[in-house]
From Swiss-Prot:
This is tRNA-cytidine(32) 2-sulfurtransferase. It catalyses: cytidine(32) in tRNA + S-sulfanyl-L-cysteinyl-[cysteine desulfurase] + AH2 + ATP = 2-thiocytidine(32) in tRNA + L-cysteinyl-[cysteine desulfurase] + A + AMP + diphosphate + H(+). A motif (PP-loop motif) lies at residues 47-52. One of its GO terms (biological process) is tRNA thio-modification. Catalyzes the ATP-dependent 2-thiolation of cytidine in position 32 of tRNA, to form 2-thiocytidine (s(2)C32). The sulfur atoms are provided by the cysteine/cysteine desulfurase (IscS) system. The gene is ttcA. NCBIfam families: PRK10696.1. Homodimer. Pathway: tRNA modification. It is found in: Cytoplasm. GO terms for cellular component: cytoplasm. Binds 1 [4Fe-4S] cluster per subunit. The cluster is chelated by three Cys residues, the fourth Fe has a free coordination site that may bind a sulfur atom transferred from the persulfide of IscS.
């Protein structure tokens, strides 16, 4: 076997392994959030980037194996960016045999007119694109709108909102539009960007660069991405832990008055004292006991003595 054949075989093996992992992660996300139901018509939004290509590819694979029946319709919005290769997506989708629609709307000119040179165009561009896609979804009777955001996007968005907007807010895997007319799903919510990138390369998807924002440096998101990548290298498993933490919130242990009713929280005068101590709260306090060099021993075995000797 030649070196070329060996490399090709290794690539196929790696691609199959990645597809299995991505298929499992997408399937888990769909099941966990009930993203796709029997009889759904899923409008798969295809931009021509690695994420949306991977999403379509994995959804088509799952469609063949799923115990339920659902339809997939690919939709691309041609925003009339200069140099956009209009033939690429139709040729790719024709080869796949997937039903698709190519929409044309000159949002590029609107964005260039409204946004000063050098400023980030992403916000306005995505808002215009979202409005068009939401409307078209209703036009074709789509019951779900699938977007290609992955786990890294979700985590980055959370930190962006924390650092720059003062909010604990990310991208939900499943979202009902404000008017209640459209249901948005993110099947790649459990998938890592580096897996998607490698899979896209191995599959040789015909990537279409975004001339409007693909080469535009979004400094804030870029800084957050760099931070997360550094953590991933220096502290393996930290990104996974962050995402797990996002799925395990406890409003009563936070400070958000909108998510938990602290105002009407009262002690029960009739409650029987069981000696229960809020373990999570103990490290936050600095109890003083002059008989123990200024500090009380909070070890569980000494907790009764601690309560007995503590004199505020």
């Amino acid at each position: 076997m030649s070196e070329v054949d060996t490399i090709a075989k290794q690539n196929i093996t790696r691609m199959n392994k990645l597809q299995k992992r991505l298929r499992h992660e997408v399937g888990s996300a769909i099941a966990d959030y009930n993203m796709i139901e029997d009889g759904d018509r899923v409008m798969c939004c295809l931009s021509g980037g690695k994420d949306s290509y991977t999403m379509l590819d994995i959804l088509l694979t799952l469609q063949q194996r799923a115990p339920i029946k659902f339809e997939i319709v690919a939709v691309n919005l041609d925003q009339k960016q200069p140099g956009f290769p209009e033939h690429v997506l139709p040729a790719y989708l024709d080869k796949l045999g997937v039903a698709y629609h190519i929409l044309e709307k000159d949002t590029y000119s609107i964005v260039k007119e409204k946004i000063p040179e050098g400023k980030t165009t992403c916000s306005l561009c995505s808002r215009l694109r979202r409005g068009t896609l939401y409307g078209f979804a209703q036009h074709i009777g789509a019951t779900k709108i699938a977007l290609g955001h992955h786990r890294d996007d979700i985590i980055e968005t959370m930190f962006l909102n924390m650092f720059y907007a003062g909010k604990q807010k990310a991208m939900p895997p499943k979202l009902l539009s404000d008017d209640g007319a459209n249901m948005v799903i993110r099947p790649l919510a459990y998938c890592r960007e580096k897996d998607i990138e490698e899979y896209s390369t191995l599959k040789s998807f015909p990537i279409i660069p975004c001339n409007l924002c693909g080469s535009q440096e979004n400094l804030k998101r870029g800084a957050v991405k760099d931070m997360l990548q550094m953590w991933d290298k220096q502290h393996p498993g930290r990104i996974e832990t962050i995402f797990t933490a996002m799925q395990n919130t406890s409003p009563s242990q936070g400070v958000d008055r909108e998510n938990f009713d602290f105002i009407s929280l009262k002690r029960n005068p009739d409650a029987v004292n069981t000696g229960d101590v809020a373990d999570a709260d103990l490290p936050a306090f600095d109890f003083v006991d002059i008989s123990n060099n200024g500090h009380i021993n909070l070890d569980i075995s000494n907790r009764i003595d601690v309560v007995a000797t503590f004199k505020p």
